[in-house]
Design a protein with these regions (language model features):
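Hydrophobic h-region of N-terminal signal peptides that target proteins for export
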Residues: 8-17
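A phosphate-binding catalytic loop at a beta-strand-loop-alpha-helix junction
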Residues: 117-130
Length: 189
């Protein structure tokens, strides 16, 4: 047990070290994660938080859920465009994510790689999975670093784990690493 404490502390520090320091106002957004100077993901921002996002230099907002979700803002496109940011939506069904949806997002990112982008969904589960894939495939971030960042928000369920594995396999990337645990979370009660 005595040897476990330093190991747990080291893992905690290494898991959080890949994420950038965050402006406290942005940290108020549900599960906000800053991966680099130009890329972040989050859950659903409020109307007011979109102003904070714009004030922090974001130039593009990509929404990967449906506008009829409980906390969604049906006029988010107008809010974002009204703040002089680009808006893109790729509706991703949480129970059935498709490769074409990920590649639509990735293609948009690759066209303007330096555009400061917030990728968001409802709670940052879809968005962290897409962020994980994008960072590993296009930004050459290690599987272990990207997985640790994703795990600060959630551990993918079977549908999302299989989706992640499919996209990685399509790109000839092995999902395994020494610190990666792809064990499924316990079923919800």
């Amino acid at each position: 047990m005595k040897n476990l404490v330093p190991l747990i502390l080291a893992l905690t520090v290494s898991m959080s070290s890949a994420l950038e320091d965050v402006n406290p106002d942005l940290a108020e957004i549900t599960n906000f994660r800053q991966y680099s100077d130009t890329f972040a993901s989050a859950g659903q921002p409020t109307r007011e938080q979109f102003q904070t996002i714009a004030d922090n230099g974001f130039e593009r907002v990509v929404y990967i859920a449906f506008t009829n979700n409980q906390n969604a803002l049906p006029d988010a496109d107008l809010i974002v465009k009204g703040l002089d940011m680009e808006y893109m939506q790729v509706p991703v069904d949480f129970s059935n994510p498709l490769p074409d949806e990920f590649y639509a997002f990735a293609d948009a990112m690759e066209r303007n790689k330096d555009k400061k982008t917030l990728l968001h969904c409802q709670v940052n589960a879809r968005a962290t999975a897409f962020s994980f894939l994008y960072r590993v495939i296009y930004d050459d971030i290690s599987i272990s670093e990207a997985k640790a960042d994703m795990n600060t928000v959630w551990q993918p369920n079977e549908v999302w784990r299989d989706f992640i594995f499919e996209i990685l396999a399509n790109n000839e990337i092995d999902p395994n690493c020494s610190s990666c645990d792809w064990t499924l979370p316990p079923p919800r009660q």
